[in-house]
């Protein structure tokens, strides 16, 4: 092999090695930041009731479910909160220290992200409250009632006066 080919081959191999190392580092970083989503039943029993798919202790996960009524315990000296989450099966305890979302309450759906410290205990770093897509804050709803009712415009929850009058008119003409 002549020296020119040898130098080209070494440059190509060096570039391929660099790309391989960069790809490996990117994949390693992504693997560290992946938070798999589980329901409380899947945390306890594994996905599809297969025990080898259970999350391991120390793994970062996201868990979604309903806050079990009567399980919210707040520490009066700090922002620490402890509550249980469940779906249709067993419960998982969530420990969180921080300010909870305004929509957080018992019976409400939430998603908690954190590290599994015991088979059924999650140390959460983030808690998100779910709400339906038709949610309107009470202050905004009161404002909408004040503004839209006199105009006969629908307030997203009840039909407007104009809609009712049209319906009565159509029913009367049939």
From Swiss-Prot:
Chain residue ranges for the region called Disordered: 149-174
Tell me the Pfam families matching this sequence. CcmE
* InterPro entries associated with the record: CcmE, CcmE-like_sf, NA-bd_OB-fold
| Any Gene Ontology biological process | cytochrome complex assembly
> Could you state a single Gene Ontology molecular function term?
heme binding
State the UniProt keywords alphabetically: Cell inner membrane, Cell membrane, Cytochrome c-type biogenesis, Heme, Iron, Membrane, Metal-binding, Signal-anchor, Transmembrane, Transmembrane helix
Give the source species: Histophilus somni (strain 2336)
- Keyword set includes Nucleotide-binding: no
- Cytoplasmic face: residue ranges? 1-8
The keyword Heme is annotated on this UniProt entry: yes
Query: What membrane topology term does the record carry?
Result: Single-pass type II membrane protein
SUPFAM superfamilies attached here?
A: Heme chaperone CcmE
On the Periplasmic side, which residues?
30-174
The source's superkingdom equals: Bacteria
The record describes the protein's role as: Heme chaperone required for the biogenesis of c-type cytochromes. Transiently binds heme delivered by CcmC and transfers the heme to apo-cytochromes in a process facilitated by CcmF and CcmH.
Q: What is the protein's given name?
A: Cytochrome c-type biogenesis protein CcmE
Could you give one GO CC term from the UniProt record?
plasma membrane
Bilayer-crossing residues are 9-29
| Bias kind Basic and acidic residues: ranges | 156-174
Q: Where in the cell is it found?
A: Cell inner membrane
What family, per the record?
Answer: Belongs to the CcmE/CycJ family.
List of residues binding heme: 131, 135
